[in-house]
Amino acid sequence: RVVRTARKLDEISYDEMLELASSGSKVMQSRSVEFAKKYAVTFEVRSSFNHNPGTLVKEEVSYMEKVVVRGVAADKDQTKVIVSNIADKPGSAAKVFRALAGANVNVDMIVQNAASQGVANLTFTVPQADAGRVARVLKPVLAEIGGGQVAVHDRIAKLSVVGVGMKTHSGVAATLFQALADAGINIDLISTSEIKISVVVDLDRADEAVRAAHAAFALDKA
């Protein structure tokens, strides 16, 4: 629906499917893939509208590290939280995130910036469903560590590119960042793992960002 030239994958690894599922792809639930991986169950994801062959999800795939990026996903149900002017000392961040964990708030991308005069800023993302509770949960924590402010920004989306080939190929981040720059899309936050790069962009540019990344990695090519 977002990229008209998107094509079906014949196969994909458990790890890639897990990353896509947790990054906004609405194909599979993460827990289902985790269960299949745990018991080494190969399964097929098919369309409910036709009888065409689907995508096999399994441990090892034939392309493995030859193909750098296998998929692009956008999660539009994210909120950015900025906790500013907290004491820049050991334990401050731990107390903030311990409180959020105790309230079952799932934190994703995290950036800490040291500001001047002994204070720091924490920026992270949470699901929109949890955003309303963040300020309430952190109020007593901020009082304990000497103050701070909480600001919530909900007009964001998390764009992710996923592929096991990232393990052995350089330049993936540069390609993604250049594609977004060429489209005039600003990057807010950046997070990386072994097989995934995620960035936060403006919600209104999310679909455009998906198309730019899709084209940059030639995902419409067989």
Where do the protein language model's features map onto the residues?
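C-terminal catalytic "cap/lid" subdomain
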Residues: 1-222
